[in-house]
């Protein structure tokens, strides 16, 4: 059985925050932010918009793109680190709001690696033969856990959501190879402070980890698929920082024109990062049926996930 993406959708809130916003209260500048991160702007949800609202909008698009009805979905997995509340989960809320019926629904927390973790998890369920249309959503409202007094992190994060329907696809298409892992010894470098409820990051250590693991994990899944870097049509890394992304691309050994860059428009949107990039490249015509694509993410935990996928239903 070939398991892959049957439907796709993404959503970014309307409100756009440019770098000039931060110049008003932080010792920073558009020039510095752009040079060090590649970020020019990011989308922030309104106060009355929560993660489940972002996830809902992306899910509607994915369901429509797959040509199915909500009642055809037999499981919901939401990757998020910013659920509306500890429970019920965002997936539970989506189940009710979409009208899928009483299907299994759960949130999966692997921070910025969450979308990779959830896609790989969904593949296993479909491969078992017991599930046929699994809604996987990566959604985060990072603006609510961003410390706006911390110059090193305040400028980095945005909000958004992306969704896919994972199920059986045509011969020769779908997920070819994958990897996920974690290193708990690095958890202290990227975490949510239990006292302040805000994100804390040791940027130097996270940078070193990210460059190494994104490049190495991408290389391993390409090799596992019996491919070479020359076979890759598009590389879509987690959009954390342009310098991390460029270093990972170089380690993988692909040309700059084959790497998706959306960090300039969205910032780091955690679990929504990779699907927002997919959305951009679909709209730009850079993703076509039968293209071979490498997806890779890293996040708090520390965690990582990667896959090669042959695009198409």
UniProtKB/Swiss-Prot annotation:
Q: In which pathway does it act?
A: Lipid metabolism; fatty acid biosynthesis
Look up the EC number in the record and give it.
2.3.1.180
Mainly localized where? cytoplasm
Query: Superkingdom, according to UniProt?
Result: Bacteria
Report residue spans for region: ACP-binding. Answer: 239-243
Work out whether the entry's keyword set contains Transport. Answer: no
Q: Indicate the residues that form the catalytic site.
A: 112, 238, 268
For this protein, the record's InterPro entries field holds: ACP_syn_III_C (IPR013747), ACP_syn_III_N (IPR013751), FabH (IPR004655), Thiolase-like (IPR016039)
Q: Which UniProt keywords apply?
A: Acyltransferase, Cytoplasm, Fatty acid biosynthesis, Fatty acid metabolism, Lipid biosynthesis, Lipid metabolism, Multifunctional enzyme, Transferase
Q: Does the keyword Zinc-finger apply?
A: no
Enzymatic reactions: malonyl-[ACP] + acetyl-CoA + H(+) = 3-oxobutanoyl-[ACP] + CO2 + CoA
Record localization: Cytoplasm
A GO CC term attached to the entry = cytoplasm
> Which terms in the Gene Ontology molecular function aspect does this entry carry?
3-oxoacyl-[acyl-carrier-protein] synthase activity; beta-ketoacyl-acyl-carrier-protein synthase III activity
Q: Where does this protein have coiled-coil stretches?
A: none
- Swiss-Prot/TrEMBL GO biological process terms: fatty acid biosynthetic process
Question: What's written under domain?
Answer: The last Arg residue of the ACP-binding site is essential for the weak association between ACP/AcpP and FabH.
The subunit structure is: Homodimer.
Q: What does this protein do?
A: Catalyzes the condensation reaction of fatty acid synthesis by the addition to an acyl acceptor of two carbons from malonyl-ACP. Catalyzes the first condensation reaction which initiates fatty acid synthesis and may therefore play a role in governing the total rate of fatty acid production. Possesses both acetoacetyl-ACP synthase and acetyl transacylase activities. Its substrate specificity determines the biosynthesis of branched-chain and/or straight-chain of fatty acids.
Instruction: Give the UniProt family note.
Output: Belongs to the thiolase-like superfamily. FabH family.
Q: What is the protein's given name?
A: Beta-ketoacyl-[acyl-carrier-protein] synthase III
What organism is this sequence from?
Staphylococcus aureus (strain MW2)
């Amino acid at each position: 059985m070939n398991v892959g993406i049957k439907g796709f959708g993404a959503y970014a809130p309307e409100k756009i925050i440019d770098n000039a916003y931060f110049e008003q209260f932080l010792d920073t500048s558009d020039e510095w932010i752009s040079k060090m991160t590649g970020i020019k702007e990011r989308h922030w949800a309104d106060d009355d918009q929560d993660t489940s609202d972002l996830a809902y909008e992306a899910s509607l698009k994915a369901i429509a793109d797959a040509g199915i009805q909500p009642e055809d979905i037999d499981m919901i997995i939401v990757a998020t680190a910013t659920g509306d509340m500890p429970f019920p989960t965002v997936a539970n809320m989506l189940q009710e709001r979409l009208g899928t019926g009483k299907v299994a629904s759960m949130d999966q927390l692997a921070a910025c690696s969450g979308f990779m973790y959830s896609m790989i998890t969904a593949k296993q369920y479909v491969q078992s033969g017991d599930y046929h249309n699994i809604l996987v959503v990566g959604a985060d409202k990072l603006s609510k856990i961003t410390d706006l007094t911390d110059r090193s992190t305040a400028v980095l994060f945005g909000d958004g959501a992306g969704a896919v329907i994972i199920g059986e696809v045509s011969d020769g298409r779908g997920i070819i190879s994958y990897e996920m892992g974690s290193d708990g010894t690095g958890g202290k470098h990227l975490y949510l402070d239990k006292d302040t409820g805000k994100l804390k990051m040791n940027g130097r250590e996270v940078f070193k980890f990210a460059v190494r693991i994104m490049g190495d994990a991408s290389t391993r899944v390409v090799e596992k698929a019996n491919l070479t870097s020359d076979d890759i049509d598009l590389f879509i890394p987690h959009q954390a920082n342009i310098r991390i992304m460029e270093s990972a691309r170089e380690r993988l050994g692909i040309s700059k024109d084959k790497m998706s860059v959306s960090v300039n428009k969205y910032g780091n949107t955690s679990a929504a990062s990779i699907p927002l990039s997919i959305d951009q490249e679909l709209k730009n015509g850079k993703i076509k049926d039968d293209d071979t694509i490498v997806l890779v993410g890293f996040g708090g935990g520390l965690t990582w996930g990667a896959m090669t996928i042959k695009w198409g239903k």
